[in-house]
Amino acid sequence: MKPAALPTKEWIIQQAATLFNTKGYYACSLSDIMEATQLKKGGIYNYFRNKEEIALAAFDYSFQLVLQRFRSKLNLAETSWEKLHIIIDVLASMAFEPVITGGCPIFNISVEAPRLDPALALKARQGMQMLTRYIEIKLEEGELQGEFSCSRSYEEIASTMVGCLEGANIVARTLNDAERLHWAVNHVKEYLVQNCQKP
């Protein structure tokens, strides 16, 4: 039931975000959104023109939740090295402690990206690029500040980290086995040590 103080548009976005993140974009229908929000088609179309528009708003909402978790954790870190480890831990936490039901919205939408509406596919790419770019920035900052020296390109290290954790999230959730995720986290942290040697 919609909280009285919550605007209807926000209610639709929040309910749709959970649906898209659990069922997937293609499997989620307007009827599903109507059932979750307890609104009729006209009540939804008062705010959105179509399912694609709802999906875009829902992903933006989900992505902001991801960013909020990163910010709250990263505020506790002082060095780039600490921030890189926090990024790894936050990404891993999305499997069994997601910011929204269904797992990491960035990873989930990326799986569907090749088949998505172009605007939504662009959102998926931008989300993934923003994540990897942030890691690259932390690697560069750490090197400039003399915390460590990277033996590979920032792009390669960041892409490897994200790819490994994305795959581990999927495997761990599919098998409902958190230990497999812990293995991947340890592997990525070891990879970071091997390729970002401290002076």
Task: Indicate where each model-derived feature is located.
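Short hydrophobic/aromatic patch on the recognition helix
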Residues: Q38-F48
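All-alpha amphipathic helical-bundle segments outside canonical DNA-binding/catalytic cores
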Residues: E82, L122-Q126, L144-T160, E179, ...
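Basic, helix-initiating cap at the start of DNA-binding domains
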Residues: M1-K23, A27-L39, E53
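Amphipathic alpha-helical packing segments from all-alpha helical-bundle domains
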Residues: S72, P118-L144, E156
